[in-house]
């Protein structure tokens, strides 16, 4: 069996025993170690507090050389999450140099990252959006220009996530 | 009878706090929420949200279902009460608490304790049992499914039924079956799904037909019949008429009920004694001898051996002095018996030399068997193992080289059935000696490769695997070495092992 699946199995077992604050992770299907189901708990003292946002982590076979893809299934309104739910953070970008020069190589994917470090980054992203490279331009614009509307929109998502 | 299942400790982690909750291992999520509410008095139950492995747990699910075990941590989120809470779902908690509150439903024949009473408007129980459609709809009812999905509860029902209790007391092996949650689940699944039910029945019949076809199948059926079917049917027909829920119903009316499962089974498992007893021409005077007559008549003595090897207690009873003595008496009282045995062996029938050899060796074997030291040897588990290997080798031979088998067949009946005795006493005909050599070489080949394959220095042998384990974050070198040694260097198995051990 490949190293990737062994590594993921270890992470899964660790997480079952000692889960990390702020999210809960498991497999979508017990037979597929490469597809993880994550429930991100809206961080306290943010607009997202009280929400549970479901996401799928899709690991490539050559993990940890390459990063997984993360996609929110629950509707979530955030500058760094595009409208399809794809999460856009630097540590999930393929390793190497950024062709636009925004990100330094050490900010991008590194094989040391685990589900835990990825999710912690995502949670901190929910707390502090990065306006430099918005994936959802409308959300970024709304947050800057019409914060009240932005708040309302996020609250809507939080409410919807609770109903699931 | 364990009505109280073990308590486990579950850590509940909220964004701001951490609580420890003690709860039954098979409790429902709803029960867990009740316990959590003690710590969070401000919240009401609808606001409590338990999350585990990426999923929001639903009230009616159980902890076992999500594999939440002792020491595991679940997340707790209290929803904000911005929106109007929906009307409290009253039905679920009552249903889920039923198993624990009614540990002995049948001891108090009270309609309110009947779990099926919850399903009103279903018609009377007798109607349901007579009508497969109604039965199915009962089985499809979520309340029933929940009840039946709980093996602990099913066990309680069964164990509190006096007929079943008696049955289990007499036949511990049946008790094991009823204690096996998998078997229970399968049975329930089967009842629920008519197609599966029919399929199972068909498979069952087919399997038995196949069994009868292979040499020795009869012997296996006989044992099955004696050990399971007969006591089951006996106890069932006594008063239960095959319906384990009979005593659960408040009314104990004695109207006859149709039980499809019982009847089908009855047909599917033919009573081997019946046919053989008719064939047995003499010695009807003594029950035991009749048994042995038919047993020895069966062409499948070798398969009987197989059965015995896998069942030490049966083996012990087979070789108990009384049994051996009774065989001997039987033999001396009835000289025709050996002839009839020999007549059952095709190659012996055609070859007077072989049949003569068997005839001569039989009394000697029996003498040997009454020797305590031989009996001791027969009970030795390693000897049993050797027997098993012989049997295995033989079946391989049958598969791979049937032409070879014909050569040995006569010896096999004499030597195979009572293998080691034939070898030791050289009582068998000459052909048995060749067979003994063959067995010896087979035993050698199928010996214990594991003992020779043990590496001298595991750290050296598994250096590359050790390195990989290290790189995956398994830092305890001693444990890594132990795991690799135990798995013979299989990295995947070693990781599995390391992860599963705390």
Curated annotation (Swiss-Prot), chain A:
Active site feature = 88 (glycyl thioester intermediate)
Q: Name one GO molecular function term.
A: ubiquitin conjugating enzyme activity
Intrachain disulfide bonds: none
Q: Which SMART domains match?
A: UBCc
Q: What is its EC number?
A: 2.3.2.23
The processes (GO biological process) annotated in the record are: proteasome-mediated ubiquitin-dependent protein catabolic process; protein polyubiquitination
Identify the InterPro entries for this entry.
Answer: Ub_conjugating_enzyme, UBQ-conjugat_E2_core, UBQ-conjugating_AS, UBQ-conjugating_enzyme/RWD
Report the protein's function: Catalyzes the covalent attachment of ubiquitin to other proteins.
Would you identify the family this protein belongs to, as annotated?
Belongs to the ubiquitin-conjugating enzyme family.
By what name is this protein known?
Probable ubiquitin-conjugating enzyme E2 7
Q: Which organism is it from?
A: Caenorhabditis elegans
Which gene name belongs to this protein? Answer: ubc-7
Swiss-Prot record, chain B:
What range(s) does the UBA domain occupy? 455-501
The record's annotation in InterPro entries points to: STI1_HS-bd (IPR006636), UBA (IPR015940), UBA-like_sf (IPR009060), Ubiquilin (IPR015496), Ubiquitin-like_dom (IPR000626), Ubiquitin-like_domsf (IPR029071), XPC-bd_sf (IPR036353)
Q: Show the PROSITE patterns listed in the entry.
A: UBA (PS50030), UBIQUITIN_2 (PS50053)
Knockout: what is the outcome?
RNAi-mediated knockdown causes a reduction in lifespan. Induces ER stress characterized by the expression of hsp-4, the accumulation of ubiquitinated proteins and an increase in ubxn-4 expression. Mutants display increased homologous recombination repair in response to DNA damage compared to wild-type worms. Worms lacking both POST (F36D4.5) and ubql-1 have a shorter lifespan and display an accumulation of ubiquitinated proteins in the nucleus.
Where would I find the Ubiquitin-like domain in this sequence? 8-83
Its protein name is: Ubiquilin
Q: Which SMART domains match?
A: STI1, UBA, UBQ
Task: Note the CDD domains from the entry.
Answer: UBA_PLICs (cd14399), Ubl_Dsk2p_like (cd16106)
User: Which PANTHER family has this protein been placed in?
Assistant: FI07626P-RELATED, UBIQUILIN
